[in-house]
C-alpha cells in the first residue's frame, strides 16, 4: 500500500493525497453479492429533509457483507481483496469449501490465498471468527456483536479494533478506540485482528468536487445566514453573541446525545474527552 501525493498540475490536484493498494482487485465485483442502492437526497418518505448536506454523488452498488459469520466450521480461502465504495474498509471475497462465496471485512494482514474459518473451535488467527468466550483476554478483535446472532456492530471501519480486557461470568469487558469500556455477552461473536486500510485517514480529497462525488453537499455556517434561517444569523459582524446551537436551537458543544438508558448499566467507563 502506497501513499501518493499528486503533483500540483492544477489547483484541484495540488493538495490531493491518494491511498494506492496494488493488491486490490481491478475488475468488476462479484455480481451475485451486489444489490441496488437508491439515493435519498437526505429526504424521508414525506420528501422532507431529515439529514442536511446530502445529495447527488456517483451511483453505487451495495456489496452484501457477511457481518454474522454464521457459516460455521467450514474453511474458506480468500480469493481476492476489493474496494468497497460504501465503507472506508476494504473487503475480501472468500470461497468456502462447499462452493459458496461471501464478502467479509478485510482485516489487516489478510492476503489472497489465506484460509479462514468461523466457529467455536477455530484457531486464534487473523480473520477467524468465534465467540468471545473462546478468545484470550488481551486479544484485538473487530466486527464485534452487541447481541448474539445479530451480526457485528462495533469496530467495522478502516483501522478500527477493540481489545478484550477482562472476562467475568457471562460477560467480557471491551476497551473501544474512543476509550469507552463496556460489557458485552461472552457469547457474542468477534473476528480476530483489526480492520485493514488504516491509512484511509491519511487521504486528502483536495477539492470540493471530490466531496460532491461522494454525495456530500456544502455546509453553510449559521453565522453566514439570516436570522430567519439560523439562531446565529444576522448582525453586522461575525460574532453571534451566544452559546453555539443547532439550527433548531439545541446546544451543540458537549451536549449528550445518547438516549438509550436501558443499556447504560453495561458501560463501565465513558469515552475520554
Curated annotation (Swiss-Prot):
Single GO molecular function: RNA binding
GO cellular component terms given for this protein: cytosolic large ribosomal subunit
Compositionally biased residues, Basic residues: 253-262
GO biological process: cytoplasmic translation
Region of interest: Disordered: 221-262
Gene3D superfamilies linked to this entry: 2.30.30.30, Nucleic acid-binding proteins, Ribosomal protein L2, domain 3
Top-rank lineage group of the source organism: Bacteria
Keywords in alphabetical order: Ribonucleoprotein, Ribosomal protein, RNA-binding, rRNA-binding
InterPro entries for the chain: NA-bd_OB-fold (IPR012340), Rib_uL2_dom2 (IPR014722), Ribosomal_uL2 (IPR002171), Ribosomal_uL2_bac/org-type (IPR005880), Ribosomal_uL2_C (IPR022669), Ribosomal_uL2_CS (IPR022671), Ribosomal_uL2_dom3 (IPR014726), Ribosomal_uL2_RNA-bd_dom (IPR022666)
Subunit-structure text: Part of the 50S ribosomal subunit. Forms a bridge to the 30S subunit in the 70S ribosome.
Entry similarity comment: Belongs to the universal ribosomal protein uL2 family.
Function: One of the primary rRNA binding proteins. Required for association of the 30S and 50S subunits to form the 70S ribosome, for tRNA binding and peptide bond formation. It has been suggested to have peptidyltransferase activity; this is somewhat controversial. Makes several contacts with the 16S rRNA in the 70S ribosome.
Name of the molecule in the record: Large ribosomal subunit protein uL2
Organism field: Haemophilus influenzae (strain ATCC 51907 / DSM 11121 / KW20 / Rd)
